[in-house]
Regions:
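All-alpha RGS (Regulator of G-protein Signaling) helical domain and cognate RGS-like helical scaffolds
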Residues: 1-187
C-alpha cells in the first residue's frame, strides 16, 4: 500500500513508508516544530527591532505604514508562538539565540554590523537599507518554513501547518510590496 503525504501548497506530495506513517499518527509535535517556533520567535524579535527604527529614521508615510503592519503581525505571531510552546510545556530556548546551528546565523538574520548600519542611516539611505534588509530577513523566514516542511513529520498538525503557511504567505506578500517600494524609490 502506498501512503502519500501531501506537500505544502505549491510543493509536491511524497510517498512515505509504513514506519513514517505510524510515527505521524502518534505525533503531538516534533522537535523540528519546536526548533522552528523557537527560532521564528527570535527571528520575529529582530524584525521588531528593525521596525522600531522607522519612527525616528524615515519620514515616508508608506514606510511608516509598512512598519506598523509588520510590527502588528509579528507581535501577534510571537504571542501565538509563546502560547503554542506553553501548551506543550516547552520553554523558549536560550541556546543559540540568533544562531540556528553550527554557529551560523539563522536564515535572513542581520549581522550586528548590518543592524549598526541600519540604526545609523538616515532618510533615503535608511529607507533603502531597511527595505533591502527586511526583504533579506523575510526571505530567511521563507527558508525556515521550507526547512520545517522538509522535516519528517513536521507541520502535520493543523495548528503548526496553518501558522507556517500563514508566515509563508504574509512574508511573500510583504516581499512583493517592499520590492515594489524599493524599485519605486530608485526611479
Amino acid at each position: 500500500v502506498r501512503i502519500v503525504q501531501p506537500g505544502v501548497p505549491g510543493k509536491p506530495s511524497r510517498v512515505i513508508g509504513p514506519k513514517e506513517a505510524v510515527d505521524l499518527t502518534q505525533l503531538q509535535y516534533t522537535e523540528a516544530e519546536v526548533r522552528f517556533v523557537q527560532a521564528m520567535m527570535t527571528h520575529h524579535t529582530q524584525a521588531l527591532e528593525m521596525t522600531a527604527l522607522l519612527t525616528v529614521r524615515t519620514s515616508r508615510e508608506d514606510m511608516q505604514l509598512l512598519g506598523k503592519r509588520i510590527d502588528l503581525s509579528q507581535r501577534d505571531e510571537i504571542q501565538l508562538m509563546r502560547e503554542w510552546l506553553a501548551l506543550r510545556g516547552v520553554t523558549l530556548s536560550n541556546r543559540g539565540e540568533l544562531h540556528a546551528h553550527d554557529g551560523m546565523l539563522m536564515p535572513g538574520m542581520l549581522t550586528a554590523e548590518e543592524m549598526r548600519r541600519l540604526a545609523e542611516a538616515q532618510g533615503s539611505e535608511f529607507d533603502r537599507l531597511f527595505l533591502e534588509f527586511m526583504i533579506k530577513h523575510h526571505e530567511g523566514a521563507l527558508i525556515m518554513v521550507d526547512e520545517l516542511f522538509a522535516s519528517v513529520g513536521a507541520g502535520q498538525q493543523s495548528d503548526i501547518f496553518a501558522f507556517a503557511s500563514e508566515v509563508d504567505t504574509d512574508q511573500r506578500m510583504e516581499i512583493g510590496r517592499m520590492s515594489a517600494m524599493l524599485e519605486g524609490s530608485r526611479r
